[in-house]
Amino acid sequence: VTTETAQKESLGKALGRIASGVFLVSFTKDGKKDGMLSTFVMQGGFDAPVVVVAVNNKRPLLDVLKPGDTFVVNVMSKANMDVYKSFAKPFQEGMDRYEGIALKGGTEHPVLANGVSYMTCKVLSYAPATDHQLLIAEAIDGEQLTEEEPMIHLRKNGFGY
């Protein structure tokens, strides 16, 4: 094992210990509900409240959500494992990832009925971050829906999901 390899392994383990939540970033475009799982979400400001989502450069979401568009960040708990399993599967054409998942009515974008909370966000901008883009958005609405504890995600290796 080379010194460089050992350093990368050590750094990977350290990065993997950065605890994060598990989130469903959801949106509706041209009448079609879509979304993606994310563990790279954080609050980035207070006044106005800012939410930052790191999005892999290969994700189609980057072609869909433009400045001014809105989307939802759903905070998930262990009670949302059905959602996790549905969105963790590879996408197949015609697939409805929301099939069988309870959604809150009266919202523009999919909101998990039994999620911990949700925030409706408006895209402000993107900033490059090597293999990801930082989606910077203002939280414009939101609600706590349950008293469940948010799901916590730790990784064995910080160089992968």
Predicted features along the sequence, with ranges:
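Basic, polyanion-binding surface patches
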Residues: 1-161
